[in-house]
């Protein structure tokens, strides 16, 4: 399986984390932020993460990716759901982008390896 991803993407991290817990090998392909063509060629639009299954079929929803990876062999995500933790995470979603987004392009991440990719990210976030 191949995961098209950004290093700074929390949805990508979710998929990578369950794959690591399972010991499932993923080919991780970091896409530069301004490379919309790679995403569009696979699924017709700009979206990350994209999990390409061994049969070539793409998956777009990170929770579906997590469920698929966890279904291979013995599952590791077997504990009870914790609604109180989910509620805390939901509240954090309101403020986290304001704290993290301005810092991402300052980090030496592969999705920002070119000036054009970094500038593309900054313009997209300013317009959002």
Residue ranges: model-predicted function:
Residues 122-128:
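A conserved mid-domain beta-alpha-beta active-site/ligand-binding segment of alpha/beta enzyme cores
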Residues 1-122:
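GST-like domain detector, emphasizing the conserved glutathione-binding G-site
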